Amino acid sequence: MDMRTPPNNTDAEKSILGGLLVQPEAFEVVSEILLPADFYRQVHQKLYQVMLELHNRKEPIDIVTVSNALTSKKELEQIGGSAVLADIMNEGPTAVNIEQYSRIVKEKSLLRKLIRVNT
């Protein structure tokens, strides 16, 4: 049995999420490429899901609204609290390469799916 870590790029995931917190208008590009399940880390899946819900309701996406939505769902502490949001925001101070990062995360997600199908 192969015990290697499945394909992932958590740096790209953090950069996407951080970029969306500082430049939410980039969500149009990202949402065309990624689904929450494409993120490797469950914390990142939850954060992206909340951002997607805010986006679909045409509500602003920022550290305050995401934190509030997570608190309402009783998930803020599950992801590690407000400190995790602040760390992610610092990881992605710009959304300049967000489309490329999204494609990297999608590619890794597809590779994980292929591995699951073939095992």
Where are these regions (language model features)?
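A short N-terminal interaction module
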Residues: R116-T119
